[in-house]
Design a protein with these regions (language model features):
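RNA substrate-binding interface of SAM-dependent RNA methyltransferases
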Residues: 1-89
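Short, solvent-exposed amphipathic alpha-helical segments in soluble enzyme
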Residues: 4-9, 17-20, 104-110, 134-138
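Short, glycine/charged-enriched secondary-structure capping and boundary segments
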Residues: 40-42, 102-105, 133-135, 158
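Glycine- and other small-residue-rich loops at beta-strand/loop junctions that grip anionic moieties
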Residues: 66, 124, 148, 152
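A short acidic, often aromatic-flanked loop/helix-cap motif at beta-alpha or helix-coil junctions
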Residues: 72-78, 95-97, 150
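Active-site/ligand-binding-proximal alpha/beta "capping" segment
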Residues: 82-132, 141-144
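Structured adenosyl-cofactor binding patch, chiefly the S-adenosyl-L-methionine
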Residues: 129-169
Length: 169
C-alpha cells in the first residue's frame, strides 16, 4: 500500500491503523480521555507505540516508516505548524457531514482528490464542544461516521479504510 498521508489523532490500535495506511499517529489527550499520563508515562507509551509501528511497517512491506507522536492535548497539537489538503474531525454533532460526501465535495471543488488528510478521531462520547470549536478554528470539518457510535479503535480503522478506498488508485 502506498503512503496515504493521513494523520490519525488518538488511536489505541497503532498496528491496525498503520497497516491501513496512516503515516502518523498523534494521540490526543482530550478532556474526556479516561487515561491520564504523566510526562514519563507518555514518553514510554510513545516509544512502545513507535516499536509497534515499525513492526507493522515491516509486516506490511511499507517502504516508509510511520511516526508516532508523544500524547498531547489538542491545543498542543494545533500549536505545531502542519499543512493538509483536507482536515477532518469525527463528531457526533448534528451538523457533521458524512466522510464520503466531504471527499466528493473536495474533488468537485479542486478537480482532484486530496493527497494529505488530517483525521482527528476522538474518545467515546466525542470531543468536548470546546475541543470541536478549537479544531474548527484550525480548519477541521466535522464528519459523521454513521448512526452508530463507534469505539475509538473501530472509528480509526473505519476512517482509514474509507480514505484508502476513496483516495488510493
Amino acid at each position: 500500500m502506498r503512503n496515504l498521508p493521513a494523520q490519525i489523532a488518538r488511536s489505541a490500535n497503532a498496528a491496525s491503523s498503520l497497516s491501513d495506511g496512516a503515516a502518523e499517529i498523534a494521540p490526543i489527550l482530550s478532556d474526556r480521555t479516561v487515561v491520564r499520563l504523566d510526562e514519563e508515562s507518555a514518553a514510554s507509551k510513545q516509544a512502545k507505540w513507535q516499536t509497534v509501528a515499525i513492526e507493522a511497517a515491516k509486516q506490511c512491506g511499507q517502504n516508509w516508516l510511520p511516526r508516532v507522536h508523544v500524547p498531547q492535548t489538542m491545543a498542543q497539537f494545533f500549536q505545531q505548524p502542519r499543512r493538509f489538503d483536507l482536515q477532518l474531525i469525527g463528531s457526533l454533532q448534528s451538523d457533521a457531514v458524512h466522510l464520503k460526501k466531504i471527499l466528493a465535495e473536495y474533488s468537485a471543488e479542486h478537480g482532484d482528490r486530496p493527497t494529505s488528510v488530517l483525521m482527528l478521531v476522538g474518545p467515546e462520547g466525542d470531543f468536548t464542544p470546546a475541543e470541536l470549536s478549537l479544531a474548527r478554528s484550525h480548519g477541521c470539518r466535522p464528519i459523521t461516521l454513521g448512526p452508530i457510535v463507534l469505539r475509538v479503535e473501530t472509528a480509526s480503522i473505519y476512517c482509514l479504510s474509507v480514505l484508502s478506498y476513496e483516495l488510493l488508485v
